Amino acid sequence: MRVLGIDTSNYTTSAAIADESGFRQNRKILSVGKGECGLRQSNALFLHTVNLPEIMRALSPMEKIDAVAYSAYTREVEGSYMPCVIAGKAVAESTAAVLGVPVYRFSHQAGHLMAAVKTCGNEEIGKGEFLAFHASGGTTEMLHAAPDETIGFTADIVGRTLDISVGQLVDRVGVMLGLTFPCGGELEKMAMRSTLKKPPMKLSLKEGNCNLSGAENAAQKMLARGDDPCDIARFAILFAAKNILAMSEAARETYPDLPIVYAGGVMRNAIIKDILAKSLPNVWFADTELSSDNAVGTAYLGLERHKREVEK
């Protein structure tokens, strides 16, 4: 049984094929102009439309496809939507129609969770309740998650950012320092050259929710007074890490026995992962390659759903 998955996010055009033996994927990061912190939805939609034929062609030969799955919305809540998913929808629905196979719709967030569940190294995660932290360019959420036969996972927010996301903090500071968006990888390299021990500002956590925009302002002040850019980079990453840790600790107070799995592009960062792994027990991370936007999780969601449908 083989499923084609498609995900068209704010940052990446992705397609993948998953079956019981593993997966193949191809993806392309959307081009962003120098000094810019992301794309307009209309521009992202255009780039997905340009990228998808190339992305799909690179997966050939696909052999027999039994079902198609795609990211149809951001989160599993009413009104959750972003225009750039239209490109993925068009290709997925058309492909399924031509092949005469079922098409399954999931949330972009569920795809992230499934990619993490499949690659974190703990086969028990995803079989019952667990905590999941989704940290990306558009999301900073601590979730109480559980498997669901139809939508992949239920995910209730138990902590979130009240302003910008950790990914936005990282990218805005990176662009401030002259890096090209998305900035996570290059900012991490700069931070590795710094000896800064802790972020020079206090966290602002309330009922498990965080505020991050103050760190962007602090980084601007550090730059204005001539601080080492590497120290500014490390400050931003440490501040993000400390907030993720504090939100994780708050969730653990309510759910002390549940594992935490971390997903999303920000979780590619080795500094952040090291802090979390050394500070908390029973924490798990998506494979580095599948932390950022991908269609692998979406393909696996479709595979699991299709197996259940066939068995009915």
Report the location of each language-model feature.
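A short helix-loop
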Residues: T8-S9, R24-N26, E124-G128, F133-S136, ...
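Conserved phosphate-binding catalytic cores of ATP/NTP-utilizing and phosphoryl-transfer enzymes
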Residues: M1, V101-L131, L301-E304
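Short, well-ordered amphipathic alpha-helical segments that serve as non-catalytic structural scaffolds
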Residues: I29, L47-P61, N243-M247
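A contiguous, well-structured pocket-lining segment that forms one wall/lid of small-molecule binding clefts
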Residues: K189-I260, V266-F285, L303-K312
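Short glycine-rich, Thr/Ser-proximal phosphate-binding strand/loop in the N-terminal lobe
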Residues: S9-F46, I151-I157, F285
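Short beta-strand-loop/turn "lid" adjacent to the catalytic site in phosphate-handling enzymes
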Residues: R57-E93, A97
